[in-house]
């Protein structure tokens, strides 16, 4: 029977997605996230009873590695990279790391219990890949393998990105998804009627994961995934560009985004902590975009900017 090594970290909730990505990039075969806020938000949602849980500001993220992995070296690497998140204005809080061994059958079942189908927007529901789920009339299903956890649709930044896509897509558009991660925004774009979607990520692991998730959703032949550094070298124009990445990275794509977005097209950005919002808005407007929608959930901000000369439908217009 195969054995696995388990690494659990406890960090502030605001770095949940970034920390999950760090664990995946360190070689983890999957992660689970234990967040007290999820118990409170989902209580009675699926007709289940949850234990009483006190909401705290931290989350526990558990990653799983093969028995052969050098867990001590991985722990040091993860700790160093978590420390670097403060350079992006993110507060990790006091970092706690714990390791232990477990057998494969324990992992195979344990991590799955954290995931249930989740209706994210009016139209879109995220369903774990192993779950049989019957959609209601008009409900659009996104099948994901949350074990790879590059944004499973439940994080506030991803939720707001999905709401924004619902807002702007009417059918027939070309979409560029920058920093695609799990591919969830590309899959959603296709379900919402986009004609062609081009998804890019700098990380080869994310590109592979995105393609695997896309392949488990039927009718996604219009999504094209490739390795790419933001929008560098991209010549394909788009009706919509969506980017759910950290603010300090978003600021480097503004000019390329304005170059590629068609007139009357949109730039959707998420992953912006509150203290970075003014900076992102200023640089987007300096590039030529006008703010149409601003969304806030907790410390996270998302926005829809439009490339237009008509100021009547924009904030401040």
UniProtKB/Swiss-Prot annotation:
Keywords: Cytoplasm, Methyltransferase, S-adenosyl-L-methionine, Transferase
Catalytic activity annotation: L-lysyl-[protein] + 3 S-adenosyl-L-methionine = N(6),N(6),N(6)-trimethyl-L-lysyl-[protein] + 3 S-adenosyl-L-homocysteine + 3 H(+)
InterPro entries: Ribosomal_L11_MeTrfase_PrmA (IPR050078), Ribosomal_PrmA_MeTrfase (IPR004498), SAM-dependent_MTases_sf (IPR029063)
One GO cellular component, as annotated: cytoplasm
GO molecular function, one term: protein-lysine N-methyltransferase activity
Chief subcellular location: cytoplasm
GO BP term, pick one: methylation
Subcellular location: Cytoplasm
Binding site for S-adenosyl-L-methionine: 158, 179, 201, 244
Leading EC class: transferase
EC code: 2.1.1.-
HAMAP family recorded: Methyltr_PrmA
Role: Methylates ribosomal protein L11.
Family: Belongs to the methyltransferase superfamily. PrmA family.
Protein name: Ribosomal protein L11 methyltransferase
Species name: Streptococcus thermophilus (strain ATCC BAA-250 / LMG 18311)
Taxonomic lineage of the native organism: Bacteria, Bacillati, Bacillota, Bacilli, Lactobacillales
GN (gene name): prmA
């Amino acid at each position: 029977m195969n054995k696995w090594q388990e690494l659990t970290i406890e960090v502030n909730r605001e770095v949940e997605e970034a920390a999950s990505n760090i664990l995946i990039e360190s070689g983890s075969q999957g992660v689970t996230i234990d967040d007290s806020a999820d118990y409170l938000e989902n209580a009675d949602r699926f007709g289940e009873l949850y234990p009483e849980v006190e909401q705290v500001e931290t989350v526990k993220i558990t990653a799983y590695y093969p028995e052969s992995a050098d867990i001590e070296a991985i722990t040091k690497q993860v700790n160093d990279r978590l420390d670097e998140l403060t350079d992006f204005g993110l507060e990790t809080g006091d970092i706690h790391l714990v390791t232990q061994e477990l057998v494969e059958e324990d992992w195979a079942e344990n991590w799955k219990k954290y995931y249930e189908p989740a209706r994210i927007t009016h139209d879109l529901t995220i369903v774990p890949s192993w779950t049989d789920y019957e959609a209601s009339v008009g409900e659009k299903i996104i099948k994901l393998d949350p074990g790879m956890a590059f944004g499973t649709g439940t994080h506030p930044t991803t939720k707001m990105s999905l709401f924004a896509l619902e807002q702007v897509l009417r059918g027939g558009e070309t979409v560029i998804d920058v920093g695609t991660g799990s591919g969830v925004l590309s899959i959603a774009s296709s379900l919402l009627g986009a004609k062609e979607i081009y998804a890019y990520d700098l990380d080869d692991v994310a590109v592979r994961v995105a393609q695997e998730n896309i392949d488990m959703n039927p009718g996604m032949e219009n999504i094209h995934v490739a390795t790419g550094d933001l929008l560098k070298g991209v010549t394909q124009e788009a009706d919509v560009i969506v980017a759910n990445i950290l603010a300090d990275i978003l600021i480097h794509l503004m000019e390329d985004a304005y170059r590629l977005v068609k007139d009357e097209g949109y730039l959707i950005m998420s992953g912006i902590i509150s203290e970075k919002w003014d900076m992102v808005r200023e640089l987007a407007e300096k590039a030529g975009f006008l703010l149409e929608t601003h969304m806030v959930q907790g410390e996270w901000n998302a926005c829809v900017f439009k490339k237009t000369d008509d100021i009547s439908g924009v904030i401040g217009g």
